[in-house]
């Protein structure tokens, strides 16, 4: 500590960004972990080092001042910084013991109430980071769910050791924990957009609220948290989890919509739709993840082998071709990490808005619709629009979930895209699916397409580096509507048992024919989002990803990408017999006819204004 008192931080002769991050012992103030041990030891040996007390405490104060001066205020860094400052404050004497008046009370007040350029007060951070209506933190799910635990742990430390009750002062800390189940797919793993490794819900936030409630003998809050913790457990019954999850949930501060038919791991569907707003986000346009039969079959690609510091992250994993989205002219992109590119909600059913971000909980929704047999009561949908900044292209995506039976259902995906000022070259519709086998067929004859090796979809021509990561490419011109099957074979008997006896899961996609369209079958780099996933069907991180691309030459607004996706398995075959398309009378609308094996036909119309009729 004597050395810290006399030490100065390194000086960057280039006056670069690193100068604003550097700590006394590390190159980033959030990694000053030595503070944890030193602040625990100092009170124990304080009486033994009385002669050095002044210089030791001067060192601690210098350390705190450097953390206040350097760092990042607008994300989880601020919280890590505040944690170190509070730990230092708690070993200092009262303010009057120091000539500058900066002691225990000064630093505690600074963390809670004061603001500087690189150290916001916890109050300001909470106001900035949480959406007041949806209660979501403004980072990708992996980071957001972790922050709930960190904030809770920090708040408990302040409450226990300094008598500052942040939970009472900021009720959103508890509300956000209560809402955290909205991140879950039916398999009880979190959505995977941005820099996320999906897994079961991090219950750190719940545990910290429980700790607080127990200390304050708040029986109601203890009961609420115990019920929530039980409900988000992987094997919790539907009656529990469906009281915490909505049919439609919209988080405007991360530009994300979750749409569910229910939370049955095996039989329900969920679509996760996101743009790029907030921290730890990717350049993904309007991206989509699709769930079925126990897995997110159509996932994001993940972070990258070396997380977000590697070249593969910079060139591929954070870019649009790694996501289920549409790339314009081969160049669509924008800054990643702290991103400002949100979508706008055009239409939805049930309706969600910034002011009313959640529809009824699934338990209520099912009670209100179980007696209705009309098709419209089996459909939920969301339409969002997005301005792709690199090419100034207007994009609109309609995603719908349609239940066909207690065990089955399908998705509709209608993606429109055009450059505002014209001059469209290409629009590339990307879809990635788990699995080891991919079959692309003519939807009418059922015969495989005659696909030839190609070097299209390349960086050559001034396109994104990400195109260079796509390989084993084959293509064919679209003559008729097509049918594509992505087959996932489960190889481990223990996983077969965990997945209700399924050995083979198939995602079937039907895509509407359009002129000037080329279909590609290819492979992409391994999915590194699910490398930590339990019950993997195969070693996901060791195998390339099955990749489907439809390239529309010219604009894709009046020639939209229209697809139907149905998940099925060897133990639960699909309900769809065939899919046809028709031209509705409404200008710009898309018509879809889904014929089921039970003889019924479902007729749906996706209008240009974003609404869906049946």
Regions found by a protein language model. Give the residues of each.
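Acidic, glycine-rich loop-and-strand cores that form catalytic or ligand-binding grooves
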Residues: 216-247, 492-531
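Aromatic-lined, polymer-binding surfaces characteristic
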Residues: 1-174
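Short, hydrophobic/aromatic-enriched beta-strand segments in well-ordered soluble domains
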Residues: 429-431, 506-509, 518-536, 559-570
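Non-catalytic terminal regions with compositionally biased, polar/charged low complexity
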Residues: 535-614
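Catalytic and substrate-binding regions of extracellular carbohydrate-active enzymes
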Residues: 222-450, 555-557, 567-569, 584
């Amino acid at each position: 500590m004597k050395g810290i008192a006399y030490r100065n931080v390194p000086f960057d002769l280039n006056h670069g960004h690193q100068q604003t991050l550097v700590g006394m012992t590390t190159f980033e103030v959030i990694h000053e972990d030595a503070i944890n041990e030193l602040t625990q030891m100092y009170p124990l040996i304080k009486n033994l080092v009385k002669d050095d007390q002044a210089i030791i405490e001067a060192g601690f104060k210098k350390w705190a001042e450097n953390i206040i001066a350097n760092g990042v205020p607008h994300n989880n860094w601020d919280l890590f910084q505040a944690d170190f400052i509070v730990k230092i404050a708690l070993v200092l004497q009262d303010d009057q013991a120091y000539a500058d008046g900066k002691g225990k009370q000064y630093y505690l007040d600074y963390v809670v109430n004061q603001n500087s350029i690189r150290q916001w007060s916890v109050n300001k951070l909470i106001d900035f980071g949480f959406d007041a209506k949806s209660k979501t933190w403004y980072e990708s799910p992996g980071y957001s769910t972790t922050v709930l635990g960190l904030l809770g742990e920090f708040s408990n430390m302040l409450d226990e050791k300094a008598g500052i009750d942040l939970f009472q002062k900021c009720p959103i800390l508890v509300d956000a924990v209560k809402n955290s189940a909205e991140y879950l797919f039916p398999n009880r793993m979190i959505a995977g957009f941005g820099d996320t490794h999906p897994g079961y819900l991090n219950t750190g936030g719940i545990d910290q609220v429980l700790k607080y409630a127990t200390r304050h003998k708040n029986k109601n809050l203890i009961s609420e948290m115990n019920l929530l913790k039980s409900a988000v457990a992987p094997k919790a019954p539907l009656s529990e989890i469906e009281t915490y999850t909505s049919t439609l949930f919209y988080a405007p501060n991360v530009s994300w919509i979750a749409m569910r038919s229910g939370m049955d791991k095996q039989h329900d569907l969920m679509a996760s739709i996101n743009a790029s707003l907030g921290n730890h986000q990717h350049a993904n346009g309007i991206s989509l993840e699709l769930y079925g039969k126990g897995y997110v079959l159509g996932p994001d690609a993940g972070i990258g082998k070396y997380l977000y510091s590697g070249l593969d992250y910079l060139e591929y994993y954070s870019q649009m071709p790694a996501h289920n989205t549409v790339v314009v002219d081969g160049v669509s992109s924008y800054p990643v990490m702290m991103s400002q590119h949100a979508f706008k909600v055009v239409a939805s059913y049930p309706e969600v808005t910034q002011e009313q971000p959640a529809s009824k909980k699934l338990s209520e929704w099912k009670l209100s619709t179980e007696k209705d047999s009309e098709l419209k009561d089996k459909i939920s949908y969301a339409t969002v629009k997005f301005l792709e900044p690199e090419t100034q292209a207007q994009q609109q995506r309609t995603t719908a979930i349609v239940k066909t039976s207690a065990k089955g259902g399908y998705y509709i995906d209608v993606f429109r895209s055009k450059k505002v000022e014209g001059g469209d070259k290409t629009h590339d519709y990307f879809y990635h699916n788990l699995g080891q086998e991919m079959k692309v067929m003519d939807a009418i004859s059922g015969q495989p397409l005659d696909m030839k090796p190609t070097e299209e979809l390349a960086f050559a021509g001034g396109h994104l580096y990400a195109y260079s990561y796509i390989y084993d490419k084959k293509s064919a011109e679209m003559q008729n509507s097509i049918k594509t099957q992505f087959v996932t074979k489960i190889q481990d008997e223990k996983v077969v048992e965990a997945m209700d006896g399924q050995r083979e899961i198939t995602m079937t996609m039907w895509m509407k024919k359009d002129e000037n369209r080329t279909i590609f079958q290819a492979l992409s780099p391994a999915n590194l989002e699910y490398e930590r996933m339990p019950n993997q069907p195969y070693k996901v991180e060791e195998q390339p990803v099955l990749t489907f691309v439809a390239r529309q030459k010219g604009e894709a607004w009046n020639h939209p990408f229209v697809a139907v996706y149905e998940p099925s398995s060897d133990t639960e075959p699909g309900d769809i017999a065939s899919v046809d398309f028709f031209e509705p009378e409404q200008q710009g609308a898309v018509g879809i006819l889904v014929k089921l094996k039970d003889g019924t036909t479902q007729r749906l119309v996706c209008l240009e204004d974003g609404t869906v009729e049946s």
